[in-house]
Each structure stands twice: as C-alpha cells, then as structure tokens.
Swiss-Prot record:
Family: Belongs to the universal ribosomal protein uL5 family.
GO molecular function terms listed in the Swiss-Prot or TrEMBL record: rRNA binding; structural constituent of ribosome
One of the GO BP terms on file: translation
Protein's name in the database: Large ribosomal subunit protein uL5c
Encoding gene per record: rpl5
Main location (coarse class): plastid
Record note on quaternary structure: Part of the 50S ribosomal subunit; contacts the 5S rRNA.
Lineage: Eukaryota, Haptista, Haptophyta, Prymnesiophyceae, Isochrysidales
Protein purpose: Binds 5S rRNA, forms part of the central protuberance of the 50S subunit.
The species this protein was found in: Emiliania huxleyi (Coccolithophore)
Subcellular location: Plastid, Chloroplast
GO cellular component, one term: chloroplast
Gene3D superfamilies: 3.30.1440.10
Keywords: Chloroplast, Plastid, Ribonucleoprotein, Ribosomal protein, RNA-binding, rRNA-binding
InterPro entries according to UniProt: Ribosomal_uL5, Ribosomal_uL5_bac-type, Ribosomal_uL5_C, Ribosomal_uL5_dom_sf, Ribosomal_uL5_N
Length: 182
C-alpha cells in the first residue's frame, strides 16, 4: 500500500509537476514532508482513563504512539495548570506518512456522510494543508463500541511547496478529493 503511493509520486507526480511548473531539477519539485495529527483533550485530560482511551485511539488511527502535549503555563480561566496534559499529537514521516495518506484518501474520506470533497480553503499560504475531522468513527479501525465520546482532531499535511497553488496541484495528483479553488 505505502509503496504504491511512494512509487506514484516518483514515477508519475514528479514528471507531471516538472512539466507543469517548469522545474529544471527534480529536487525543486514539491514533496510531502510530514503529516501531523493533533487532538485537544479538554476535560478528558483530567481523567487518566479517558486520557488513555484517547491516546490508544490516536495510536490505532496513526499506527504510531502519540506524544502527550502539556500546558506551558497556567490559565486559571480554563482551570489549566503548568505541566497538565492538554492534548496529544502524532507526527508521521516516510513510509507511515504515505500509508496514512493512502488510507485517508481511499478509505476514510469516502466514509464521511454527504461527502462532496474537502474544502480547498485549508491551505495556509505556505504550501501546507490543514484538515479538521469532526468524528473519529470515519476511520475503519475505530469501533463504535469502543468510543465513549465523539471527538475530532486536526490533520496537517506539510509539503515543501512554496505556494498554495503548487501544494494544491501536488495533493490533487495524489488523489486528494479537493474541491475546485475559488
């Protein structure tokens, strides 16, 4: 699975982007650098049972153990103390990144109810794409019986593209179901 996506990039996407943008060198062609999956835990961070369930869920989705993000400073209004766990994140690179991207495009996103493609508004101006998932049940690895509370997370796809247009073209060639740009 992961080899297919990597080979698709090397054999089809690189020559296509070189022709489209007139790159002289293969190293100039935009590529995927990493995919970050992040989840804020909120109230669940106070209970170790809920925290463990969230970490296990992220590990199953990503195929890699997540790291716990801790508060850097205390905020009384949010009842947060310095060093308290507030979220969890996973950074995928290389083969795991390509495997996750393929599962996201071909298995997970089509399971979204009333799916008409993902918004092209998620680009940040520097060639990276951010996507919010509202419901973890769209991943086939997650069983409805194991979920205590529906909770979403953020997926950031970091590329080496200089512009959003290049990143859009790169992700579109990978098969990402992006809507037309406005």
């Amino acid at each position: 699975m992961k080899k297919d996506t990597k080979n698709l990039y090397k054999e089809k996407i690189v020559p296509s982007l070189m022709e489209e943008y007139g790159y002289k060198n293969v190293q100039l062609v935009p590529k995927l650098l990493k995919i970050s999956i992040n989840r804020g835990l909120g109230e669940e961070a106070r209970s170790s049972k809920e925290m463990d369930a969230n970490l296990k869920e992220l590990a199953v989705i990503a195929g890699q153990q997540p790291t716990v993000n801790k508060a850097r400073k205390s905020i009384a209004g949010f009842k947060i103390r310095d060093g308290m766990p507030v979220g969890a994140s996973v950074t995928l690179r290389q083969d795991r990144m390509y495997a996750f991207l393929e599962r996201l495009i071909h298995i997970t996103l089509p399971r979204v109810r009333d799916f008409r493609g993902i918004s092209a508004e998620g680009f940040d101006g520097r060639g990276n794409y951010n996507l919010g998932i509202k419901d973890q049940l769209i991943f086939p690895e997650i069983s409805y019986d194991d979920v205590n509370q529906l909770q979403g997370f953020d997926i950031s796809i970091v590329t080496s593209a200089n512009t959003d247009e290049e990143a859009y073209s790169l992700l579109k060639k990978f098969g990402m179901p992006l809507q037309a740009r406005a």
